């Protein structure tokens, strides 16, 4: 078998160690922006209404067909059976490539062997696959993956063609609707910013860099008299800054 490749029992060469996942881990520390009518309606990101750890969770965004890498074969993560016991989900799992236009959030964990066994001298490897075939102008809902107290979100806001992102999906996960917010990294300034222009910035998505957007010229604001077309609210649980803007009320940072 070529170096760097894996296969499951009965499915040789299907799996590759190269990651094609669309998970994106966005570090957030101390600064974000609010959306306003000043921002171009041809770009935007969906910000959540909740914050946990140091990650934002992004929800229900459109992506262009050419932005995400084509998943010729699903990525696979090895799972090793315990030497003291064997979980059926840890047995060898076939990694079937989805058909064109189909989105696989998580591959089905179908067991290859009917009754896998583990012993101290042998181990049974299994694979969990996550593959995604991008489609033109496809809208996808972000899922929340929880691992203990850690929360991770999938980034599907990968719009190289600047698709208009008008809303986030109202879901039971606590997301709220925003219109074209723009993310500002914490190294810009610990002040409030509104920007009229953004330029591409690469965020590391495992082994790939997807284009995202950040402000290229921002101006600090302590008061904003223009009327906002939509309410943008960053919850007070976000440390250490609090943001609130509604209509023509003052925009303040605390």
Curated annotation (Swiss-Prot):
InterPro entries the UniProt entry points to: Keratin_matx (IPR007659), KRTAP_PMG (IPR007951)
Sequence repeats: 193-202, 203-212, 213-222, 223-232, 233-242, 243-252
6 X 10 AA repeats of Y-[ILR]-[SVPC]-[NRTS]-[SNTG]-X-[QHRP]-[PSY]-[QSL]-[SRK]: region residues: 193-252
Keywords: Keratin, Repeat
GO terms, molecular function: structural molecule activity
Tissue: Specific expression in the middle/upper hair cuticle.
Keyword Repeat: yes
Family designation: Belongs to the PMG family.
Other comment: Has a low cysteine content when compared to the majority of known KAP family members. Possesses several C-terminal tyrosine-containing tandem decameric repeat structures.
Functional note: In the hair cortex, hair keratin intermediate filaments are embedded in an interfilamentous matrix, consisting of hair keratin-associated proteins (KRTAP), which are essential for the formation of a rigid and resistant hair shaft through their extensive disulfide bond cross-linking with abundant cysteine residues of hair keratins. The matrix proteins include the high-sulfur and high-glycine-tyrosine keratins.
Subunit record text: Interacts with hair keratins.
Protein name (record): Keratin-associated protein 24-1
Provenance organism: Homo sapiens
Organismal lineage: Eukaryota, Metazoa, Chordata, Craniata, Vertebrata
Gene: KRTAP24-1
